[in-house]
From Swiss-Prot:
GO molecular function: tRNA binding; tRNA pseudouridine(55) synthase activity
SUPFAM superfamilies: Pseudouridine synthase
One matching Pfam family: Pus10_C
Family statement drawn from the similarity comment of this UniProt entry: Belongs to the pseudouridine synthase Pus10 family.
InterPro entries: PsdUridine_synth_cat_dom_sf, Pus10, Pus10-like, Pus10-like_C, Pus10_THUMP_arc, THUMP_dom
PANTHER family tied to this protein: TRNA PSEUDOURIDINE SYNTHASE PUS10
EC number: 5.4.99.25
Source organism of this protein record: Methanothrix thermoacetophila (strain DSM 6194 / JCM 14653 / NBRC 101360 / PT) (Methanosaeta thermophila)
Gene Ontology terms: biological process: tRNA pseudouridine synthesis
Protein name (record): tRNA pseudouridine synthase Pus10
Length: 452
């Protein structure tokens, strides 16, 4: 019985009018047709939606039995078997002019099978699908959206991502995850190849640097920029090892990864040790084919290989946000410095000078780093400065200060670029002979986003 509600009739008429306008553009498969009405109705695929609308149009034409309805059947015929039966026309559905066959079930199956093959040997449980459209497909879709005038469509790539994702999940047992995928499956429709982007692993921990003479991270040769030259012995590096490189090997092997990227909470000088509880860091593991790592075993292996040089502890899995947190968190740091004076100083005078250091210090960029740091004045606080050992020409002190304060220049004054300085207060030259970082604080446990 026809609806007595004029609004219902108007909506149905508007839907069929839009559908006819789309069909007049050329033969269109059920998926591409249904996708133009994707926001209407739930619990069905676009293919089912498109097939249902085509069936509704055939039934509507049967009811009307008019020239207009026969014209609608002719528009349907190239892509609807029921319309061809009504018209008495033989043949099969013509190729879809919009997707050029990319939305056909067998094509989606093929893409899913390729993805599952590419995922073999990669340890993961969560994935996301992303589609790269060819230029022609993008142009066809743009024409359809412009001329079809449907207000209820969704993009073709969204449907491909969803439908191929369902098939991958069914075939592999892995789960789609829009927010935190371990791999991203890239479908390249121009040539049909499938590429797997493995998301990084992030491991938080602390390191202790037990020897002097090497940097925190890989340092390209200043002369050749890393290409290799006489100065660096054709290694491309200023130093032959670093904290980064020392711990890299065991991590790359354990995760079957391509590389690592090291993110530290600041860095100590090359000639300084990092002692105490260690410095917070995050290692970004690049393209790990294994993710289920035993971090206790990894810690032990790193410490075994780096024995006497570097030691790591407190390894946990974290998410990407920890990189920014570790790099940007401002920690108070405690240093132990062995100082040498140009002339003997009195112990009480030294203690007095140390107490007067407490407070704010104005530091212009030190001469030794001016080639790689902006030339500006920084204001940092010294929270404590205490004498630990004293022998006239040498002293050992501990200094607790803000992150970013240059302790060597706090002692020497750097020709007046740091004020006040210990040398200025003593009216005597002073320099740091040995420097150790003995505490860096750390990211509060409440801020650490652990990944189980």
């Amino acid at each position: 019985m026809p609806s007595e509600n004029p609004t219902d009739n108007c909506i149905a008429s508007d839907l069929i009018s839009t559908a006819v306008r789309i069909l007049r553009l050329g033969p269109i498969c059920d998926s591409c047709f249904g996708r133009q009405f994707a926001m209407l109705g739930t619990g069905m695929t676009n293919s089912e939606r498109g097939r249902s609308i085509k069936t509704l149009m055939v039934m509507s034409a049967d009811l009307q039995a008019s020239d207009e309805s026969r014209e609608m059947l002719r528009a349907l015929a190239p892509s609807c078997r029921q319309a061809r039966l009504r018209l008495g026309v033989e043949g099969d559905d013509e190729n879809c002019w919009v997707c050029l066959g990319q939305m056909y079930p067998e094509r989606l199956e093929e893409l899913a099978d390729r993805a599952v093959d590419e995922l073999k040997g990669i340890e993961c449980s969560r994935f996301l699908v992303g589609t790269f459209m060819s230029g022609l497909l993008a142009e066809n879709e743009e024409l359809l959206l412009a001329d079809g005038c449907s207000r209820h469509a969704e993009p073709m790539k969204s449907e491909i991502n969803r439908e191929v994702g369902k098939l991958i999940a069914l075939k592999s047992g892995k789960q789609p995850d829009l927010n935190n995928p371990e791999v991203v499956v890239h479908l390249h429709l121009s040539d049909g190849h499938v590429e797997i982007q493995i998301q990084p692993l992030y491991i938080y921990g602390r390191y202790r640097k037990l020897q002097r003479g090497f940097p925190q991270t890989r340092w390209p040769c200043r002369v050749c920029g890393g290409r290799g030259c006489e100065r660096c012995g054709n290694t491309g590096r200023m130093y032959q090892e670093s904290v980064d490189e020392l711990i890299r090997g065991p991590i790359v092997e354990a995760a079957d990864a391509e590389d690592t990227v090291f993110h530290g909470a600041g860095r100590e000088d090359i000639d300084a040790r990092m002692l105490g509880s260690g410095r917070p860091f995050v290692v970004e593991v690049v393209r790990p084919r294994r993710r289920d790592l035993d971090l206790n075993a990894l810690r032990d292996e790193i410490n075994r290989r780096c024995s006497g040089k570097v030691e790591v502890s407190d390894l946990i899995f974290v998410d990407k946000s920890m990189v920014e947190m570790v790099k940007n968190e401002r920690f108070e740091k405690t240093y132990e410095a062995l100082i040498e004076f140009s002339v003997p100083v009195e112990e009480e005078k030294l203690k007095s000078a140390l107490s007067r250091l407490i407070g704010f210090v104005e530091q212009r960029t030190p001469t030794r780093v001016s080639h790689r740091r902006a030339d500006k004045v920084r204001r940092r606080a010294v929270h404590s400065a205490e004498l630990e050992e004293f022998s006239g020409r040498t002293a050992r002190i501990t200094v607790r200060c803000d992150s970013g304060l240059y302790v060597k220049e706090l002692i020497s004054g750097d020709a007046g670029r740091t004020r006040p300085s210990l040398a200025e207060l003593l009216e005597s030259d002073a320099r740091v002979v040995e420097l150790d970082v003995i505490d860096v604080g750390g990211v509060p446990n409440a801020k650490i986003t652990r990944i189980s």
